[in-house]
Structure formats: C-alpha cells, structure tokens
Amino acid sequence: PLKEQRDTVRDLRQIGLGVMGIADMLIKLGLKYGSQESIDFCDKIGFMMADASIMQSALLAKEYGVFPNYKKECVLKSPYFIKNTTVQTKRLVEEYGLRNSQLLTIAPTGSISTMLGVSGGIEPIFMISYTRKTETLHDGDTYYKVYTPIAKTYMEINNIDKEEDLPDIFVTAMSLDYKDRIKMQSVWQKHIDASISSTVNVPNNFTIEQVEDLYKFAWENNLKGITIYRDGCERTGILTANKPSNKKKTVEELQEELNEAVLEALKNNPNECPMCGGEMFHSGGCSECHDCGYSPCSI
C-alpha cells in the first residue's frame, strides 16, 4: 500500500461489521419484509449491534489505546453516539475512548450469501425460483426450476407444491412496494455509522414520475443515498457516437458472423486454434485442435 493508505488505516482504524440474511430471518420469524413489525424488529437489532460494537471498541481502547485521530468531545456530542448507546456504553467510551473511528457498514454480501444459500445484506429475497439450464453434448438441453433455499425448505416442511401457495411473508425484490423497501433501509441507517449497499428493484413499466416519487420518498425518509434498478434495462456506455439500433440480430445471423470471423482467423494463422489458442493439427485435407476439439470442417 501507499504511505497515504497506511497512514489513513493507522489514524482511523476503520472496520465494517455488518449483517447478512435479514430477509431469511424475517421469514423464519413469520414477519413480512417491510411490514411495521419487521421494521420495528430490525430497529431493535440495529441498536443492539451499534451499542455492542461501540462497547467492544471502548474495551479495546482500554487495552490498546484509542485511534490516533480520536477526538473525545466530537464523539460524545455526536447524535449517532448519543442515540445508539446505553448508559453503560457511554460511560466506557467517556473513560477509555474508542479504538475504531468506524464500526458498522452494510455490505452487499452478494457472493458469500449465494454461497451460503441465504439472502444478501438487508435485501429482500430476489426471487422465489428461477430456471436453470444444463447443457449436454447430445440433443436437448435440460431445463429445471430451482427454488431459493428458504422457500424450498418451507415448501418441503409444509407440503406445498406451488410457489403461488406460499404465504405473503415471501415477498421478493420485484413484488415488494418500494416504500416498504425504503422504510427498511431508513431504519437500518439510524444505526450504521458508515454506508449501506442496497438496490431498490422496480418493474420495467415504472414511469419517470414514479422514479421521481421514489427519490422524493427516500429523501423524506432521510436516506443518504439510494440506488434503483428498473427491470429489463440494458446498460450502455456513458458516451456513444451513434444512436444504437433497436434491430436485434437472429441466431443464424450471429452464427454466420462467428463462422466468418473464425475462418478469417484461421486464414491469418492456420496453425493456431481460433477458439482456444492451441495448436492445430492438419490431416486428410482438414485440421483439428487436440486441446478443445475444434475443427473448421464441422462449421
């Protein structure tokens, strides 16, 4: 790391404790994500997390000292500190200070939550189910439905065959009212001293006026920031020279373009496989790559 980075880490000692699986937890408790009961419950969890982490940071400061940039008066007068600590924690901080300038953050936890089979961060579950395709070397790929782990477990325990029969506690990112989503983020923000990673998903027919109302509602609920994603939107570069064409190419047209590009690559370098870069072996008027099995004779 650069000297400036080392100095910043040493002077501030920032860490980012967080949460994962909130939506799964609410389902197991029988609470609908975004309901007032769920928001009140998360409010209590957030306070407990903040108070406990501040207390532990004070105890670490007792043993190892405060972070170099610690300013006692600023911390003790901070509205965040006052609202998120018990009397006992306030006394510990007043006596020993804090080891860390930053303690809590809500990371997206996208990869690890998928790996562990739980919902990410403070997000609602994304989908009840999705379709997975398994490709084979023979004709006919296999398509099958895969359920989100929490939904699959619930359906097995309660002998439910169709996801339509699940109770209304199984709200998803697309079925959840954006106001309930914003209220949930707002209550967590009260207890997080850093940042929150989250996305509000809205349907493709969401209008410009509705987007304006969404941002206004987020502002009214004191959110520091909000990210939305409208279903079906395509990403493009920030700068474009020409207006993109709405015409989509057929599979046959794309395959023809690919074949032409492959043959052109072989023409320029007949000894290198255009697919994997391996060596092409020539025999019987044709050639084949022994690494990936590609042969131009099969085009």
Name each region found by the language model.
Residues C292-I299:
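Short Cys/His-rich micro-motifs in 6-15 aa windows
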Residues P79-I82, L92-R99, L104-K248:
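Catalytic alpha/beta core of large soluble enzyme barrels
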Residues E260-N268, E279-S283:
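Short, flexible, mixed-charge glycine/proline-rich loop motifs
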Residues C273-C276, C289-C292:
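Short cysteine-rich clusters marking metal-coordination/redox-active sites
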Residues P1-R6, R10, Q14, K32-T109, ...:
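Internal maturation/activation junctions in enzymes
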Residues L29, F41, I45-S53, G117-L137, ...:
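Catalytic phosphate/nucleotide-handling subdomain of diverse soluble enzymes
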Residues T8-G30, R181:
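Core structural elements
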Residues H282-C286, I299:
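Short Cys/His-rich "knuckle" micro-motifs
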